[in-house]
Amino acid sequence: MSVMNEPTVDFHLKLNEQQFHIPNELLKRNLKQCQKLIDKEATALEKSFEELDRLVRNPQNDESSMALLNEIIQKVERLERKLTKRVNVELQLLQRIDARIKYYQQLDQIKQSGDRNRLLEWYQSYTNLLISDYLTRNSMYEGEDDISCSSTPPPARLKRKLSSASSQLTTATSNNDPDRSHVNPGVEYLKQQGLDLLLDYDILLTTNRISKQLTINHELGPLLDWIKENATYLKHTSSMLEFEARFQEYIEYVKVEDYSKAITCFQTHLVKFLYSNPLDLQQAAGLLVFIKACKSNISSYVPTPRHEEIVKQQTLLQSKEDFWSFFFLKLPKSSKKDHKTNIEVKNNELAASVDIKRYMELLDDRRWEKLNEMFLKAYYSMYGISYHDPLLIYLSLGISSLKTKDCLHERRAFVSPNNELSEFLSSEVLRNACPVCSPEFAPIAQKLPYAHQVQSRLFENPVMLPSGNVYDAEKLKALAQTLRKRKLVVMGEDEVLDPIAGHTYALTDFITMYPT
């Protein structure tokens, strides 16, 4: 690496702007929460002092005055503890910002000194930071194994706050507890390297928890809590995350045939989206009618055991009169108790005449992946974090500068009854040392553009064999000599082996190539 050609410190600061943007946003949130807390408690204390002032004017109210005074003192002490907690959060955030400023000041000093070794050490630490970021985002979070074994139904709510500054810092601090059986490897690696102040891993842990709950456990509780806490931001950005989350909650209730809760969810949370998502609501209502027909068309569907309570609720919605009573709190005008309609039979007849494929799509588990992507985009956008992993972005940039049109084309040796020969050709002759073609980087390189190479490297003596394959003549002769020496192939001194086609050719079969 040339120190002279290395990017400037300003370039690195712009590239890693989120390292300062995130704590700045958390500081703003913490300040707003402090202000709300002070305003709320100040109003309550003001009323208490007014009441105390009224009581002390009458000597007969001395006991009441003392009781109220003690209550005021307790309120002030509680306020002091809460404010102390907020101040500690602010100090931690300021400590992060200070550490990051010093980190890039160190880079500036290294560049000015021109010390190559120290520069490489700085880049090694930066690489460790990228690795920690990737592991924190994508690893299993603490206690996930326990949660995945829970018998709680998918729509259940987990009452916890996950994105306030104080709760995130508290959650991150709890990772130091040695009694915890599951620790995020990204956070562990970050602390081992002494870089924990350079990455807002508490923010990443929060999104990791919610994301894994969605994709692995199909649990909506943490996401719904986060949506409620950040409703103002989601409304400001016109995000449809709340609708999709509530829609999925409705679908989960319908799946387990808890129609009463499904209808309540529809009335409480989905009706307000009537004007923005009318077609989706129409489809949601249709799912309630065709759910049994959809299940009968899904061969892999395993029915969920219903609780006694759900079975009891089911019996309440068996007729037209029952639906009218539930929705409109009255019976239809044409209702006659002596003439009940068999709704199940009519539903089967209706399902036969309706394309239920669009309703079956609502039961697809891929909806959880879609919901997870929508959440990640909203979450990362709120904090100004890159949606894509920074480590993969850097790798993609490096790989695309090496990728040529010859990459990712697998070369297989011919199948030979001589296993020793096949092994030698595969491991020694046709082995591709190109990093772009390696199993680790090939998936990343698939969709990347080719590099604009301005130089070409040609064989010194290119020849084409009758098979159409082109090789370096001297390397073919050296390979033939090695094969004869190892007694892997029986051939004459004037013959060579095509390692791809597996045919033996004489030297006189060479066709000299002239690149133009």
Swiss-Prot record:
Compositional bias ranges of the Low complexity kind: 163-174
Region Disordered: start-end pairs: 143-185
UniProt keyword Nucleus present: yes
Boundaries of every CTLH domain copy: 203-261
Zinc finger residue extent: RING-Gid-type: 434-501
GO biological process: negative regulation of apoptotic process; negative regulation of gluconeogenesis; proteasome-mediated ubiquitin-dependent protein catabolic process
Family: Belongs to the FYV10 family.
Biological role: Involved in the proteasome-dependent degradation of fructose-1,6-bisphosphatase.
Protein name (Swiss-Prot/TrEMBL): Protein FYV10
Species this chain originates from: Eremothecium gossypii (strain ATCC 10895 / CBS 109.51 / FGSC 9923 / NRRL Y-1056) (Yeast)
